[in-house]
Amino acid sequence: MSLDQRGDSAHSVAMTGQQDDFSHLDGIGRAMASVARSPRLTVSVVAGMGIALAWLLLGAIAVRGAVSRLPGTDAPGDTMLRYLPQLPLPDFLARFFALCLAPAPLHASLGAQGGALTAMWLLMAIATMLPSAAPMIRTYCEIADTARIKREPVAHPLVLVAGYLSVWLAASAMLAALTLAVDAFASPGQMLDPAVGIAGAAALSIAGLYQFSWLKEACLEKCRNPFSVLFANWSARPIRIFRLGMEQGLWCLGCCWALMLVMFAVGVMNVFWMALIGLFSLVEKQAAGNLPTRLAGAILLVWAATLLVVST
């Protein structure tokens, strides 16, 4: 009998024995045991907590950014954000926020500021993109659940999520480098302020034009139909599932990378636009047809032209 089979046998005995109610544990212990028995529930809890924590941290950064922004450089929603309380933060979070919001790496190296900005962009990806990846994660959990019923080995769904997020980590590093470049050459004020003039119009134009591209359509088709990709590439090996998660992350990045550029035109830490982009990504991946995508592209192009005319 293999190790996996012995583990399954022991698990079955435990589940059918007198200890399956975990009565010897306290309430928290029983709750944790219930979560641990269900990979699908585990993934839902971890993803939900990650998304909630990401939004909490992003909101705190946005409030501090709105308060510190110079007059005349307000981003949309700053007036409302200034009325929100600035909660006391641990020292390490205060330093992290300072690195994200500072106009230059004052008491830290450029690498430290780049690392902080990478973490900030990754938080944005978790907050806005992970919800739209829920159908893909749920589909994997359903296939994995069916395999477990048949006593087949399965890689944990969190391995798939880790592969997915690794792609966004790499993208976050590139967006952090772009943030530093925009701050050095095109920022009107502090770090993360909205880019104006040609820089802002260029970001909106690229995002708008990409909505009409064949690559956007191909990536969107893959994101809308995860079952065929997951089923065709199914494996019990964690490394294969990690790579599968990376593949799904690349399709998602192909759908949404251009929309991230919109954040440069409205202020990188604009939580209202973050929420709007996250909601649009969710709707776009669930909708049939290209109407939402093309409509968003047209709006972005008109916006870019208007910004360019107003700023000249």
Q: How should each PLM-predicted stretch be described?
A:
Residues 279-302:
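Interfacial loop-to-transmembrane junctions
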Residues 43, 109, 113-117, 156, ...:
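Residue-level signature of transmembrane alpha-helical entry/exit and packing/kink sites
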Residues 115-142, 162-171, 210-234, 238-285:
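Functional transmembrane helices that embed catalytic/metal-coordinating motifs
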Residues 64, 305-312:
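Juxtamembrane boundary at the C-terminal end of a transmembrane helix
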Residues 146, 150-181:
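Acidic, low-complexity central loop/insert segments
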Residues 3, 12-122, 146-149, 187-191, ...:
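Histidine-/acidic- and/or cysteine-rich, low-complexity loops and terminal segments associated
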Residues 42-58, 163-175, 307:
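...captures the hydrophobic TM-helix bundle architecture rather than a specific catalytic motif
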